[in-house]
Amino acid sequence: MAASMARLWWPFLARQGLRSRGRCVCSQNPRRSFATEKRVRNLLYEHAREGYSELPYLDMESVCACPEKAARSLELRKGELRPADLPAIISTWQELRQLREQIRSLEAEKEAVAEAVRALLANQDSDQVQKDPQYQGLRARGREIRKQLTPLYPQETQLEEQLYQQALRLPNQTHPDTPVGDESQARVVRVVGEKPAFSFQPRGHLEIGEKLDIIRQKRLSHVSGHRSYYLRGAGALLQHGLVNFTLSKLVSRGFTPMTVPDLLRGAVFEGCGMTPNANPSQIYNIDPSRFEDLNLAGTAEVGLAGYFMDHSVAFRDLPVRMVCASTCYRAETDTGKEPWGLYRVHHFTKVEMFGVTGPGLEQSSQLLDEFLSLQVEILTELGLHFRVLDMPTQELGLPAYRKFDIEAWMPGRGRYGEVTSASNCTDFQSRRLYIMFETETGELQFAHTVNATACAVPRVLIALLESNQQKDGSVLVPAALQPYLGTDRITAPTHVPLQYIGPNQPQKPRLPGQSATR
């Protein structure tokens, strides 16, 4: 499989001037144990070195052509790498390029020597050719070349690993109109609707949900841990309604519905610009003693990107639009933020849009605008008040060239809360994962990728419950969701359907087999 993949990509790589040695090491070295590996690993690089994919295509030519621009991007994003790290990366790349040129020259000479030897053998008998001074000189030169090449290959591997360990942490380029700074510098580009007015003090979504018996978050630490929740009755129907409403709208607009794996290899995460082996990380890792290098996805974006990994899209199908509803898993390591409620939870349902376009900013920017318009349309039909933000440099992460967030008003919280995000990743992800398209002339080129939240269910639920609450405790259902709930209002049950009978309560009910005095 590795050999066939190398044959597939080699014409493209050769045209781009990138050389991959194509050595599959999976049969030469045993797999290293995740349990014993202590150094910081680059799973995407290892994935390629083991022969599963080609080495990520680093656009180091652009970095070296304008190092000041690359350093400026590092400074503005305030990420893991700083401008002071850039010279070492450039130096390593230049050293590796020179070494590979030396190897190429020696290998070409070795092939020429071998060809000359074959010609002599074809024209003379074996006994006679052994005495030929030209033959002896060629054999001596061949041995000398092999001796020169022997130490160069491990040097190449060492430099290559050193380069990828650092260069894969370089961020994407940044849109010139992106605000500079942290999230406080986000630019409001649009406001939709008005804040709902109440004749009473609005309640938070958790209080509303508990009184309506549609959300349960209490007494779950021994069941599913902190930051977990149940949705019941109308709460569950709201979730299903939001998913079906969103999917129906997007499928009618030409999106292809997808389901994706929840468990994915670390290389796919890193190809998307995420770091599953960081410490701390928001990504859940499966026990490596049983399943090496599997992680729970925090967004369907990873699975959708993995679907296109090492594949080319037909030119006539561009732009490709995909939509997927999935369960997302996030560690939410900063437990000091939003410890209760549905705003920050370990698992939730989300509908995600993902697009693949041809090259050039014009096409991917148009698709980003389209995704953003769909987000606005969905939230408007749900009757929410929200604002669209152009996110600043420190909020872009590694992959985003430009990013827009939408924050919905949440009256119970008394502030806006993020409900969607949309990012143009240009060719950042496709260069790492080899997401490509085939032109009408049969040429392979890197595609652009765009991703956007269509509906993050728990946060939209917060906005809906808090914005549509009534004085009597009921909640009005938006017209767009009424067909899925079969009602226009959610009301409290007439009795208590489930009563806690466990320990740690003042008046514990008597269980079977217990005496009244116990």
Swiss-Prot record:
Residue sites binding ATP per the record: 330-332, 345, 418-421
PROSITE patterns, per database record: AA_TRNA_LIGASE_II
The name this protein goes by in its record: Serine--tRNA ligase, mitochondrial
EC number in record: 6.1.1.11
Enzyme class: ligase
Domain of life: Eukaryota
Catalytic activity: tRNA(Ser) + L-serine + ATP = L-seryl-tRNA(Ser) + AMP + diphosphate + H(+); tRNA(Sec) + L-serine + ATP = L-seryl-tRNA(Sec) + AMP + diphosphate + H(+)
Pfam families, sorted: Seryl_tRNA_N (PF02403), tRNA-synt_2b (PF00587)
Tissues with expression: Ubiquitous.
Residue positions, PTM N6-acetyllysine: 110
Biological process per Gene Ontology, one example term: seryl-tRNA aminoacylation
Function (record text): Catalyzes the attachment of serine to tRNA(Ser). Is also probably able to aminoacylate tRNA(Sec) with serine, to form the misacylated tRNA L-seryl-tRNA(Sec), which will be further converted into selenocysteinyl-tRNA(Sec).
Predominant cellular place of this UniProt entry's protein: mitochondrion
Modified residues (N6-succinyllysine): 195, 337
Entry binding sites for L-serine: 299-301, 352, 453
Membership in a protein family: Belongs to the class-II aminoacyl-tRNA synthetase family. Type-1 seryl-tRNA synthetase subfamily.
Subunit structure: Homodimer. The tRNA molecule probably binds across the dimer.
Pathway connected to this protein: Aminoacyl-tRNA biosynthesis; selenocysteinyl-tRNA(Sec) biosynthesis; L-seryl-tRNA(Sec) from L-serine and tRNA(Sec): step 1/1
Gene that this sequence comes from: Sars2
